[in-house]
């Protein structure tokens, strides 16, 4: 009677395997992986005693901790049946060129339901076996050798639980069928010991595995077992469950989501296609990606809004936010935070919901949480469903990104009228990457008016350059950008842009405040002041009437009409205050600023209209949010105490007031008292930088408080390059108002 050689990789479960083999007539003979040689095993086989081999579980990695196991497998394939368990599977996959890596989950003594193909060692076993797992490594489907096929996976997460050689009688399972908590273990062993010889077919035809050349296994077995799902199918099933659960939560029922949309609680849209085509260079769709089925964890603790700001400030045209939670570790809250983070940028990136969208409800979710577009994957949708979802998305103002992987899918995308098509170089059924996919699909477009994008696997300028030559307008980059140490430099190099030049900062603008007459205004204008401030606060010593303010406004407008300055487009990748200060600096001058303090919004709006103000300065405790309702740019004052405490609101908050004015915290709180605050506090605030810039972009401020012709140069030097304007009032005054010599001296001291 022949025997089963059981190679023990120093694991206690080897005893259980021994017991199962013995109970089904396998006649096991156990030897540890370093206590036998391949020559001895060859002798056993030559003597006709050795009929089959089992490679046991074991700790460690197959290359370093499996002893003779790999050599035994290499020798035995094609000669006799081989079964690998856990470490045994890893040995087989690794030996044949596959990748053994982190499984995406750690399981030690936990059970999972395993679905299988119902043939080979799984012949006549029921589906969804409860199976015990002790491992953190597994075979990676994207690198699985072509000679192997997947035979089983976990139902809930799609991790490979079994593989089979396509030609030889070699089977392996990742889980532990020998455990007392596993179902069907002895049935699996009984199937294995019935196998004969080294190849499928012939006397092994009973188990259903076709011999080489007889074709692939059928899609479904006669016992009703489902065909083995691809990764895409697993994700599809999981997302259906996720959506079903979300729809049952009271706050996110379809009716409540629809009501929220009807109340316009969602952020306003921008045109996705328009944002792509308006980009003067190759449009980069920068992806926020914490993990993936193929790579496992990439940046699991990454902050989505922080990463989004990095991308936006680096020049990304689109920010792709993965919202799938199980495999990609994303969420809808990530997308909403991203949308809010980039909202204040002058030409913000479009926001893409990158997910496996299967229903109108998911499109409603996307719109509610700030998306400008959604991804529709042709491979996941029936043609009619694809058309319905495309039309519905367009009806909400969102032109979808339609993803294809081959010319057949491209035809479906074109048939429904897609305007932006992304070609995924990664086949979502097996997650293999083929960088030529985009080129093949592009050739099938035949010059149609479609914005074509290349998706996935792009990590170098050479990748991008190749596609651009073929007419590709945009590229999606995820992992490479997430891992880049310098996001802006990497993004620019990716699309072939030179490094940004350091442009010297211009000298600050000059604001002469407290203008009380047309004579004061003429002095300031003739001296070269950029901004003139009029006080419109009743009860203060410099307050002027509306009629006087109108006269000053007319004088300012007349002087401005002779200016040759032209508005400039702000940098598309500049933060809020930097872009706003650039816009104000580029306008024809002088500009008239109306100063208000703790007055009603209606009074402010009336004054803007009656006087013709160019800017409004909120000098009291007004809410910053008022800036949204005032039709001209708003300067908000923040008061700095001698100790450096700042009062007045959220000084670095973007998207509301266009400018920040730093003044001393005087007793009256009104300013204009000739008091300065320590300028090192201004430097500290400036160096804190714009939000999202990590201190690399100085916070632009207007410096005020106790400035004079004698000290303004020192103040600018001490505060640093973030001072884009200086504001003076009492420092250039005499008994009767502004003093010509002082005004001229102040402007000269600033300009140098």
UniProtKB/Swiss-Prot annotation:
Keywords: Amino-acid biosynthesis, Aromatic amino acid biosynthesis, Decarboxylase, Glutamine amidotransferase, Isomerase, Lyase, Multifunctional enzyme, Tryptophan biosynthesis. Residues 3-202 form the Glutamine amidotransferase type-1 domain. Residues 231-495 are annotated as: Indole-3-glycerol phosphate synthase. InterPro entries: Aldolase_TIM, Anthranilate_synth_II, Class_I_gatase-like, GATASE, Indole-3-glycerol_P_synth, Indole-3-glycerol_P_synth_dom, Indole-3-GlycerolPSynthase_CS, PRAI_dom. Pathway: Amino-acid biosynthesis; L-tryptophan biosynthesis; L-tryptophan from chorismate: step 1/5; Amino-acid biosynthesis; L-tryptophan biosynthesis; L-tryptophan from chorismate: step 3/5; Amino-acid biosynthesis; L-tryptophan biosynthesis; L-tryptophan from chorismate: step 4/5. One of its GO terms (molecular function) is phosphoribosylanthranilate isomerase activity. SUPFAM superfamilies: Class I glutamine amidotransferase-like, Ribulose-phoshate binding barrel. It catalyses: N-(5-phospho-beta-D-ribosyl)anthranilate = 1-(2-carboxyphenylamino)-1-deoxy-D-ribulose 5-phosphate; 1-(2-carboxyphenylamino)-1-deoxy-D-ribulose 5-phosphate + H(+) = (1S,2R)-1-C-(indol-3-yl)glycerol 3-phosphate + CO2 + H2O; chorismate + L-glutamine = anthranilate + pyruvate + L-glutamate + H(+). L-glutamine binds at residues 58-60, 136-137. One of its GO terms (biological process) is L-tryptophan biosynthetic process. Residues 509-752 are annotated as: N-(5'-phosphoribosyl)anthranilate isomerase. Its EC number is 4.1.3.27, 4.1.1.48, 5.3.1.24. The keyword Lyase applies. Pfam families: GATase, IGPS, PRAI. Coiled coil: none annotated. The active site is at 86 (nucleophile), 176 (for gatase activity), 178 (for gatase activity). Trifunctional enzyme bearing the Gln amidotransferase (GATase) domain of anthranilate synthase, indole-glycerolphosphate synthase, and phosphoribosylanthranilate isomerase activities. This is Multifunctional tryptophan biosynthesis protein. It comes from Cryptococcus neoformans var. grubii serotype A (strain H99 / ATCC 208821 / CBS 10515 / FGSC 9487) (Filobasidiella neoformans var. grubii).
